[in-house]
Amino acid sequence: FQHALGAMHLATKAVHALRHQQVRISDDEAEALYACMLLHDLGHGPFSHALEHVFFPKNSHEDMSIALMKKLNTAFDGKLTLAIEMFTNNYSRGFFHQLISSHIDLDRLDYLKRDSFFSGVTEGNINSERLISMMMVKDEHLVFNAKAVYSIEKFLLARRMMYWSVYLHKTSFVAEELLIRLFDRAS
């Protein structure tokens, strides 16, 4: 829940930064982006990726997120249609999908910093505000100012270090394996 709010907060920062650079973003587009960031991990089961294949053996969490968003869209009389188009990369302005899901997206900007803080590992402490301030749109695609090269390198290195230090750490693997065995035994 905190991650969804954090990712949405970064979306508000990105919209503000891009509008400041004269990128035309309507209020409907901004709201759709915010909805995407709030709902992007809706398809995750408990314990995130660790039990994804246990609960949804035939679908990824992204597939489940889309299915749940479509159900919500029906309940909300189509108010999430634009958000679903952005989420599934079916919207004409591709930079919105890039903000939601790409190599440097708002999701990653939030979870790297958040996971770094809560794990006590400093490698993931990135300057997301600076990266967002360096975002630009060219031909409806997300690009970065040339001055962002160092920040992008730091982000990519931080992501790799977080995988080595936290996500792929032996303790994480053991904890995931214990969870999987518990659920296998219970079923």
Name these PLM-found stretches.
Residues 1-35, 43-187:
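Sequence-structural signature of the catalytic-core scaffold of metal-dependent phosphohydrolases
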